[in-house]
Swiss-Prot record:
Location of the protein in the cell: Plastid, Chloroplast
Entry protein name: Large ribosomal subunit protein bL20c
Species name: Euglena gracilis
Source organism, top-level taxon: Eukaryota
UniProt-listed GO biological process terms: ribosomal large subunit assembly; translation
Molecular function terms from GO: rRNA binding; structural constituent of ribosome
Assigned keywords, A-Z: Chloroplast, Plastid, Ribonucleoprotein, Ribosomal protein, RNA-binding, rRNA-binding
Amino acid sequence: MTRIKNNGISKKKRKRKISKMKGWVGGHSKLFRTGNQQLMKARHYAFYDRKKKKNLNKTLWITRINGGLKYYLTINEKYNIFVSFLRKTKTYVNKKLLSEINVRDSKSFSHLSKPIMKSTGINL
């Protein structure tokens, strides 16, 4: 019985990985070991930064909503108080939607916010 080597499969794996390393500087694009290390690192950063991007977007939305509350309603209420008022009045709107309403159509944001704040007892 002849000995079977994985030469063809190994070459195929290496070729696939090296094709993803194109455009990198130095040995990272030419040498397999250093390129493979760089590829693993790049994948790790890609995963980490996808999570980080979501967190940054959430903070941006909260900042926009908070700014809209201060500017259009002329109150110094914080975002978390506003959200608790939304929950008390059973108005379910997510952060992204509130932020987009504030940016694109600020008058409708103030019209949306005023009845909620009045129903909870805050004088505007």
